[in-house]
Amino acid sequence: YAEMYPDACVLLVDTYNVLRHGVPDAIKVFDEVLKPMGKRPKGIRIDSGDIAYLSKKARKMLDEAGYPDCTICASNSLDEYIVRDLILQGARVDSFGIGENMITAKSDPVFGGVYKLAAVREDDGSYTPKMKLSESAEKMTIPCLKKVWRIYDQDGKAMADLITMADEVVETQHGITLFDPIETWKECTYVNCTARCLSTPIYENGKRVYNSPSLDDIKKFCKAQVGTLWDEVKRFENPHRYYVDLSQKLWDTRSTLLKKLSK
């Protein structure tokens, strides 16, 4: 394997015994196969056992053997909680191989996305708002053609999202007051803030008008957007709620339609 992939040689070291056989045998391969070729090892991978403890011992063994640049990868059904705990324990891990828990979330194994009718286009080009009634207020749909705006503070941190009618423009020069669409008595006024429209047309008149970004661009954009969230929102335990509110105009339209349909 090392002879075939000398520039990308990552060896699994936990098949039998990590510290007694795995790491020593990997070092032997590095010495006897890669070194004569003038190549440096890419890394080793630990897929079982006490990864925090084993990675510290493996790091020491690799350093003493003259391979401080050899990385250590950890795998074995990792999720964000295990990764966090490994970091807190000071594990000497350079990268984490996350498989099934990234492609299928334990808490939400099925993405519950459903299309719901929001408006009907009439013959004259106008739109008639539509919504679904439900016994649960949270499950009632939001009618009309809409836009989504993100409100940022003066430091560029995201404070809340605001859903508006498609023809609305969010002005923030004099501050903006948002309220919870369910518990309407809960409101908050933001000053020294800015608003950015998140809605981007993908298709117009049946034709695609959006150029798909590269995977690298998607990754950079996602990382940048997550960086705008407060740490209190991103923490695992008891995170702060990130609010998504409705504009007054949209909330009034929804309430009027709800009263009409409930008669």
Where are these regions (language model features)?
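Gly/Ser/Thr/Ala-enriched C-terminal appendages of enzymes
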Residues: 60-65, 70, 78-263
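Buried, small/hydrophobic-residue-enriched core segments of structured protein domains
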Residues: 1-68, 78-82, 88, 104, ...
